[in-house]
């Protein structure tokens, strides 16, 4: 084969590797494009070597071409014959002085091949039957997200192995910037009249069916045509007869799925020429096919700079593309609005992956544009084009509001699985959240997972639920590679914060009225969307949305509280408490009217269509807003409000002990609020069976959930904290500690603790002895009829006896936890909270009667901890709450071991051993720094009790004091909040 034609076009684009091209690459300042060019040159070099291997055969065939009509290939893919005949004729006409033996750097003459080339040629001839591994043109979305190897199939082998959803939905993008000529051509194509035909379609397109260009067209290239590139283009002609743009080297054969014609988009006249790729373009622009107008569909919707909706949109921004995404180049618009509002209102900073992306997870990260050097938004941004597909594959329709935001973070199937994880119970007998970050169920599982009529939820709440579940889920998507969980959780956290609009609870973007800004200013005071002044002309936020915001704050605060950043969690807890108080969640809503609703549904029908629930603003519902105050609120919404308040009430008291702070939510704010329902009745939506309920903070143990056994303890803890704050008051504390009022409060709190202990024993008898003797058949039937949280397989495989045994074990575990916390509250009531003050013992409290009583409760708490380890070895029942009570119940044992050392009683030694075991289990389940630290301190003290005194005994005691001094419960101490 003569190389004259190849040599002639080498100055425009040398496709093969050589010393000259290598030097040019070394001097390039664009390493990303260097990689692309080198990979493309390798592919083209392999193509050239294969041609050289068959040079002898093709020369003989070409010589007989003019005389033998059968020598011409009828197959468009037989490019060896086609290109050889055509380009010899081309070179003979235009270059009479050219020598076929001349060669340029980067090209090899077939007559002067080196031994390496001949060896490669021989290898390729001998291995022609073996499959050649080729680089795939595109990886699926899952493999691209996980950065794993993909085979390009649908579904691919990796997704089949791990059970993932294999999709190719992300936008195709390429690097490089557009030339001025192409930018002008794009603008001209956008302003062309729709339906205007081309005057000369054959001339404009420059292509024929099958991807070939006519001979006269190729002769017009005048030295800028590369036959190897054309051969590679022809290889993909059957799968893609007409390429929408000129693919760069190395990009040939890639299936272009993003440029499919849309029936909803009318064709527009004019074409858009392809774009050169930063010095690596080897084709003349005139040889590139036109861009069908259906290809411009996504750009047609991105007219952010066009103030007139009816005028032709400006597709391309005025500023040049300089390697990064411009923040204002694509403010995502709703194509149905005449005055669109940008969706990217909340930029999330300091993201390590794709920092300029302001789409809140809408565009796939770390991707390049498809055919323009500008970002193309994901199809999930436009509901009219993509949301229809969600309903066909989505298991839980409740996720619809958040799907556009998580499209590039997690697949839909994983989102549904995470929702299952959120509502998963660790027990089949009684509802108990399996996730350590779900401290109590606020919402009814069936209302979220209903296949046709789910609860209407805010995107922020759904994102926070997915984030909470992703912390502990064992899905392969989150465990392989090991960094996947951290990356996904970080993106879900940023998305949740962005959707929540922290501390700003006004109307969402796009829902404001024209005079919203004026309504945010009253009497010269800018209230700025903090929920103080809703739109007085009728724009009201729904009660469900308000509750969703508070629940989202709870999710954020809970996970952060369980981490090492406990002090930072108070910002989120404070926001949740403040918003709950503002929404008056501590008060019962007025009763519903007896009239039926307009849609004909019953008032408290739990299966009613949530889309027909017209919940008003809570300010209006409480009678503080204008308009009609006769509002119908479903029982689900009422119970959600109650449970959310009581959860915040309990965590307020729990965190007051953890962080040595006063209470935020007071008892007088919720004296008239009904106590939460039994969890099993709540999940079954059996409101009739829970008709009688007490109001106000509870004091008695009533159930297996945190609202049944833990909430009464938090009510008593709140009174102990108030008493402790009064004792330590800087001015009145000294007088109060010796007053009769203080003694009366101590006696009253002790009476409440005794009442709780009595109800705890009754609770144990009712659910253990009664079930074992068969005396509580009605209770068993009632409990079993409301276990909708158990999977069908679990119900089918469980027998009645196993269910009863599991219920007994669960009850004993609840009793053990309740007993331990009750003993710790006795210690807090009688003793000191600060470990350094205990060790110093400046007031000789260790010799008082109250110390002896407190020491008895410390031993009792350790015995209860042993029972807890028996029924719950990994302490997974309530890890979020249990740590601080285990710590406070251990301080007296540490004091005894430090003072008595070898003279300690056997019960104290056993108690210390139990505390060490419990702390080790806590570290495994919910690892926190203070638990690791105190475990080391207790081990050191236990070694001293057993008589193993180290040589540096004094130094070890000093180190123990320094460690304990980090956690102070004095006047200015912050407890666990370092």
Swiss-Prot record:
SMART domains: Fungal_trans (SM00906), GAL4 (SM00066). PROSITE patterns: ZN2_CY6_FUNGAL_2 (PS50048). This is Xylanolytic transcriptional activator xlnR. It comes from Aspergillus clavatus (strain ATCC 1007 / CBS 513.65 / DSM 816 / NCTC 3887 / NRRL 1 / QM 1276 / 107). CDD domains: GAL4 (cd00067). GO terms for biological process: DNA-templated transcription; positive regulation of DNA-templated transcription; xylan catabolic process. The keyword Ribonucleoprotein does not apply. Residues 140-166 bind DNA. The gene is xlnR.
